[in-house]
C-alpha cells in the first residue's frame, strides 16, 4: 500500500512539474501570429546607426531621422533627427560638418528593404516604415527584429 502511495505522489509531482514547464515555455513564445499571404509593399526603410568618428556621414539635423541621435567626432550630442519617414520634411541637402555619426534605436539589418518579398505590416520589423509601390506610407512594422541567426548556414 505504501508503494502505491509513493507512485501516486511521484506521478502527481511529475504532472505538476510538466504543467509548470509547459506554462513557462508558452510564456516565452512570441504570441504574434501573422497570416501567410504576401504583402503588396514597394519598399521599406529602417533607420539605422551610420558612420563613425573615423568615417563620418553626410547629413544635417533636418534630414536626419526622428528617433536617431547625431553626434560629433568627439561623441558630443548634436541633435535628434527631424525628418519623419511617414511625412518627410523638405530639407536642404548640405552636410553638417559637426555631425560624424548617428545612433538609432533599431540597428540590426539593412536600412533599405527592396524588394520586400512577402513582407506584410504584421511581419515587418518594428521601427521600419513600409511604403506602397506608389511611394506612399503604408505602415510601421509590427514584429520584433531577430537578434541573431539561430540557424547559421552550414
UniProtKB/Swiss-Prot annotation:
Site note Reactive bond for chymotrypsin, residues: 93-94
PANTHER family in alphabetical order: SERINE-TYPE ENDOPEPTIDASE INHIBITOR (PTHR33832), WOUND-INDUCED PROTEINASE INHIBITOR 2 (PTHR33832:SF20)
Disulfide bonds listed in the record: 34-122, 38-118, 46-128, 58-95, 61-79, 62-91, 68-104, 121-139
Name listed for the protein in its UniProt record: Proteinase inhibitor type-2 CM7
Source organism (scientific name): Solanum tuberosum
Keyword Disulfide bond: yes
Family matches, as SUPFAM superfamilies: Plant proteinase inhibitors
GO molecular function, one term: serine-type endopeptidase inhibitor activity
Similarity section: Belongs to the protease inhibitor I20 (potato type II proteinase inhibitor) family.
Cleavable signal peptide: 1-31
Amino acid at each position: 500500500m505504501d508503494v502505491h502511495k509513493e507512485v501516486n505522489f511521484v506521478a502527481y509531482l511529475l504532472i505538476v512539474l510538466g504543467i509548470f514547464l509547459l506554462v513557462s515555455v508558452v510564456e516565452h513564445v512570441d504570441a504574434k501570429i501573422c497570416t501567410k499571404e504576401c504583402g503588396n509593399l514597394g519598399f521599406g526603410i529602417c533607420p539605422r546607426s551610420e558612420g563613425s568618428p573615423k568615417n563620418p556621414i553626410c547629413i544635417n539635423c533636418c534630414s536626419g531621422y526622428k528617433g536617431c541621435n547625431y553626434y560629433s567626432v568627439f561623441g558630443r550630442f548634436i541633435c535628434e533627427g527631424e525628418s519623419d519617414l511617414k511625412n518627410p520634411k523638405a530639407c536642404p541637402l548640405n552636410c553638417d560638418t559637426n555631425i560624424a555619426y548617428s545612433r538609432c534605436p533599431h540597428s540590426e539589418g539593412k536600412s533599405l528593404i527592396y524588394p520586400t518579398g512577402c513582407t506584410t505590416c504584421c511581419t515587418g520589423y518594428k521601427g521600419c516604415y513600409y511604403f506602397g509601390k506608389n511611394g506612399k506610407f503604408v505602415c510601421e512594422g509590427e514584429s520584433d527584429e531577430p537578434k541573431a541567426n539561430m540557424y547559421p548556414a552550414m
